[in-house]
Structures are given as C-alpha cells and as structure tokens.
Amino acid sequence: MTFKLKPATKGDIDFLVNLRKQTMSEHLDVAGWFMDDTGHLERVLINFEDCYLIETDQETIGMVKYLNHPDKIFVMQLQILAKYQRQGMGRKVVEYLIELARDDSKHVELHVLKANPAKLLYERLGFAVYDEDKLEFHMTTQQ
C-alpha cells in the first residue's frame, strides 16, 4: 500500500481531534496524563502548519506532524487509524522521514510515551533511546 502526505487544512481539524483521541487516549491514560477534548484540540493546533494527512487510495488513514530543522527532523506526532495499524503504514511513513533526513545529512528524533508499544517499531527502524523523562522516551536515529 502506497501513501502520500497532504498538508492538513482547518477543515481537517475535527478528523485530527478524533484521530488523536482514538489513538492516544489509552496511552495517555496509562501514563497518567488525562486529556479532555480541549486538550486534544490544543495539541492538534500546535505547529499545525507542519501537520500532514496520510492518504492512501483516496482515503485519509492518519497524520504525521514533523519539524524540519537544519540538523534534524523532529517527529512531533504520528497517528494511524486503528483499522490501518499493524499493516506497515506507520513503518512506511517513518522510513520516508528517515530517508528525507538522510538525503540532507540529518537524523530523526521523536518522543514516545513509555506506555506506547510503538517504541518497538522505532527500535526496529534503528532508533535508540538517548534520554527519557517521567512520561516519554526520547529517541533518535544515527546521522
């Protein structure tokens, strides 16, 4: 399955809030980070100009938000609809970002909630933990 990234628009906000609630609420609850609808909306709107919808076969299946810094790409959020999880789409998006970074001699960084099993995917793709805080592992690829 192939995908394309399309810049999110204000018309996508409802989808993005619902996607975030569907994909993040359980992990946030386990971490003790309880978030209401307003909190989810606030997170969606942070760096909104760097938010991209993940589309395949004319269907929107998720989103990725990343910052392209001079020395690295920082993945702020990656969320895939539940019915498309475990089908390799998250892997493909992360591999795309790793390749984008390598083309510019950069590395990729991200933070993942300690309760989120996506950490295993990131490790399989070459990420390693370089730091952590109370809630998250901070991970990076090699440059």
Give the positions of each predicted feature:
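Conserved N-terminal entry element of GNAT/NAT acetyltransferase domains
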Residues: M1-G11, T141-Q143
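Conserved GNAT-fold acetyl-CoA-binding loop/helix
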Residues: K21-N47
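Conserved beta-strand in the GNAT
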Residues: L53, E59-L67, F74-Q79
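A conserved beta-turn-beta hairpin within the catalytic core of GNAT-like acetyltransferases
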Residues: L67-M76, Q85, D133-L135
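A short, internal acetyl-CoA/4′-phosphopantetheine-binding micro-motif in the GNAT/acyltransferase core
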Residues: L78-Q85, V112-L113
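Conserved acetyl-CoA-binding loop-helix of GNAT-fold acetyltransferases
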Residues: R86-E99, R124
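Conserved GNAT acetyl-CoA-binding A-motif
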Residues: A101-L113
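Conserved beta-strand-loop-alpha-helix junction that forms the acyl-donor binding cleft
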Residues: L110-K119, L135-Q142
